[in-house]
């Protein structure tokens, strides 16, 4: 087959799939008050240009006569997804925003922007980077706000920035003034919320980590300090794999804990005492297991008994881009033919956030969630893009090669240290297209891709 002909056909397939997606998302509108920033039920989310590498992968699949798989990649890329703003100069970023807004206007759709440029981003790990200092960050935020103008957009502000404060990074206190770094982080988030929310149609959500990270009272206090009351709400599960049932319950508790700590009734004993809240890890009413949602009834009961007149009102959104099959569990690698030890399994599970295999795309973006405070399910993480080089050198993989090492796997310690045994290859860098993972996600989508 001629490569150029295949590419032209596939581009038409991508375009047709995108058109079908944008025309099928509209539903009957409902009236919204000007002050209400909750997305209306007829919201149509923006579909960005296909991710770099996706068209090439689909072309390659067609050349191998794998039409079904090529169409799966096309369908994935024709689903609304977030646009990540991860750096560049204020002028360059403003230009990217302006271009995206023009494309979104053409689609009559609402774009989702992820702002990911906080100083000290990702604790210097796989996605390290960010602005040099607060002044540079504030200027970057100003440029984005100015470019947005009066257009409706959704902003997801700085994933991991609140769940992973500088105090969580393990910095050497002789090298980093940790209290100052934490104070700066909160100031940066507060400024960003205030500046972005000045735009009349900008809807801002801030970072709450996920249901298997910070405990409910901890993240609630952090969200309050970060200024969540000035935003529409918070988001969870970005770039993660937790099932939406867990995330929705966790987020509902966080919203409830906020209301609890602001309730002045009964002598004001609740005021500011977010630490009293039960969580996904603890309830005084019974043993709670973060991995067993049936035990979460004890936390539900705690809130039912202690809320008083408080009514949760803080909204949230959930990233469903890769949670169709839930989180990774390495237990099968303890059995033949792998026969990996308990310590290896523990390391693999702890690194389960990093390019886990056999996951799937989750619920496509929608505002029809059935949960009062859950504004939307969104595809925030770009599915198909690598989480990073997930290997033993980075601490997220372990493997006993003396027990299981197929032909073609590396045989030297140096190469094994940068090899991913779960995929049987060397992972692409963070943000690069990972074709094997992309196809795996599409094939295992839940619900299936259309």
Feature locations, PLM:
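Bacterial N-terminal signal peptides that target proteins for export
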Residues: 2-14
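C-terminal segment of classical bacterial N-terminal signal peptides
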Residues: 19-29
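Substrate-binding cleft of extracellular glycoside hydrolase catalytic domains
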Residues: 88-91, 102-207, 218-232
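Surface-exposed substrate-engagement region within the catalytic domains
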Residues: 33, 60-72, 214-403
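Cleaved targeting-peptide boundary
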Residues: 32-40
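N-terminal carbohydrate-binding/catalytic regions of secreted carbohydrate-active enzymes
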Residues: 39-147, 381-419, 426-429, 433-434, ...
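Short, glycine/acidic-enriched loop or turn micro-motifs at the edges of active sites
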Residues: 161, 210, 322
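Hydrophobic faces of well-ordered beta-strands that scaffold small-molecule active sites
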Residues: 41-47, 82-83, 111-113, 153-157, ...
